[in-house]
Amino acid sequence: MAINPLKILFVASEVEGLVKTGGLADVARALPLYLAQKGHDVRIILPFYKTIKRRDEARLIASRWLPTHPGLPDIGYRIYQMELEGVCVYLLDCPQYFDRPQLYAENNQAYGDNGERFAFFSAAALHACEQLDFAPEIVHCNDWHTGLLPLLLKTRHAHNPFFQHTRSVISIHNAAFQGVFGREQFWAMPEIADYEQRISYDYGHVNLLKCGVLYADKINAVSPNYASELLTHLGAHGMANIFQQRAADLRGILNGCDYKDWDPAFDDFLPATYDVDNLAGKRVCKQTLQQEAGLPVTDLPIYGMVCRLTEQKGVHLLLPVLDKFLHHKVQVVIVGSGDPSLAAQLQATAQRYPDKLAFLNTYDDRLAHLVEAGADFFLMPSLFEPCGLNQMYSLAYGTLPLVRAVGGLKDTVVDWDAEPEHATGFCFNDPTANILLDAMRRSLLYYLQDPERFAQVQRNAMNTRFNWPDSVTQYEQMYQDALARQ
């Protein structure tokens, strides 16, 4: 059912193509683009960081002062405008907050004023709408960085005719990061004092994600299974009671995959392309991966992994059993950076097995694409994974994902044994090293003993699609439900 075009303000702390640290940026680029293709007037707004790409394309359109509190100084900022694939992007420039080397942290140390920085961003995003005469029907917030916007719409702007028809939604990309800050950072926000009891994390601290969840008109998690997990104490990172309060307004919408960037038939990063009907190029990619990783060029199965080196990604589950697994006739290629301790352990293991394990303590797009194309299996033993994108890429590239059945991984990967006709990979449940090892050995056994079945599962994987237009239809319904709230 077609719906009338809406005015949508998409508020995010990062957008792929301009600035990115994680999966939020991918969604913040793709979702507005596909909404715009459906005829909606979508405008993205984000901070004008020092690290923004294509800065020279941004043009100054306004200079304004954000009112704060009687007796306290207003905050000056400038509004820049550019386009990203035809979608209007506003960049809020305030050097005291955003003229820094990184987005959120330096040397693994978060900026001490992140609460103040993103409180300003939230307030300025709404202020900028008025200055630009853009009255959105939907303000789409994302994660803790924008958690104050729903509260501001219901307090500061509750009787503002400009926002009379505006409703807010918030997408939860990762509830582990909640934006908890001392209340002194919100000196420009009198609303915080009035509502502190509801949105406080502990005495004297404000939880911005909690704020967004409590005051948004509708809430979505980035996969159906993750939405269910947020209602449990095990999956909600201390916020289960808050999500339970809003359960009627919470839904799960699976992220789409942007196949124009992730299609092995048209991937400029690859030494050879391929598709489901002709996998010759995949064999070339495998040989190139082995060469670039410094491994012998053989027919051994390759297990790939591309991730941030964090506990969330399950690296600590893999490390205790990596030695045992490398005693089999396999190769493993791990690409990623992050926790120095995890990196050191991986490096030490690679030195013990130079012909079997390659650890590349880095990240770049070309290498990520090569691992997806050249590996036979892709490891994602995550402790939690709200949606996950790499498993979608792996499926498209005929690289069978081996995942822990959590969050979006459970929604997107069909286990070899659980549903033989529709299998696309391998799943395991318990977050223990030995259970992971069992799953890896199971995948290896099937690879060696049943190549015909492996080829069929590979075809199933490559024919699986998670298209953004399907997700957009669900977002449109959520927007309509939000607008129906009184």
Curated annotation (Swiss-Prot):
<comment type="similarity">
    <text>Belongs to the glycosyltransferase 1 family. Bacterial/plant glycogen synthase subfamily.</text>
</comment>
<dbReference type="InterPro" id="IPR011835">
    <property type="entry name" value="GS/SS"/>
</dbReference>
<dbReference type="GO" id="GO:0005978">
    <property type="term" value="P:glycogen biosynthetic process"/>
</dbReference>
<keyword id="KW-0328">Glycosyltransferase</keyword>
<dbReference type="Pfam" id="PF08323">
    <property type="entry name" value="Glyco_transf_5"/>
</dbReference>
<dbReference type="GO" id="GO:0004373">
    <property type="term" value="F:alpha-1,4-glucan glucosyltransferase (UDP-glucose donor) activity"/>
</dbReference>
<dbReference type="GO" id="GO:0009011">
    <property type="term" value="F:alpha-1,4-glucan glucosyltransferase (ADP-glucose donor) activity"/>
</dbReference>
<comment type="function">
    <text>Synthesizes alpha-1,4-glucan chains using ADP-glucose.</text>
</comment>
<feature type="binding site">
    <location>
        <position position="20"/>
    </location>
    <ligand>
        <name>ADP-alpha-D-glucose</name>
    </ligand>
</feature>
<keyword id="KW-0808">Transferase</keyword>
<dbReference type="InterPro" id="IPR013534">
    <property type="entry name" value="Starch_synth_cat_dom"/>
</dbReference>
<dbReference type="Pfam" id="PF00534">
    <property type="entry name" value="Glycos_transf_1"/>
</dbReference>
<keyword id="KW-0320">Glycogen biosynthesis</keyword>
<comment type="pathway">
    <text>Glycan biosynthesis; glycogen biosynthesis.</text>
</comment>
<protein>
    <recommendedName>
        <fullName>Glycogen synthase</fullName>
        <ecNumber>2.4.1.21</ecNumber>
    </recommendedName>
</protein>
<dbReference type="InterPro" id="IPR001296">
    <property type="entry name" value="Glyco_trans_1"/>
</dbReference>
<dbReference type="GO" id="GO:0005829">
    <property type="term" value="C:cytosol"/>
</dbReference>
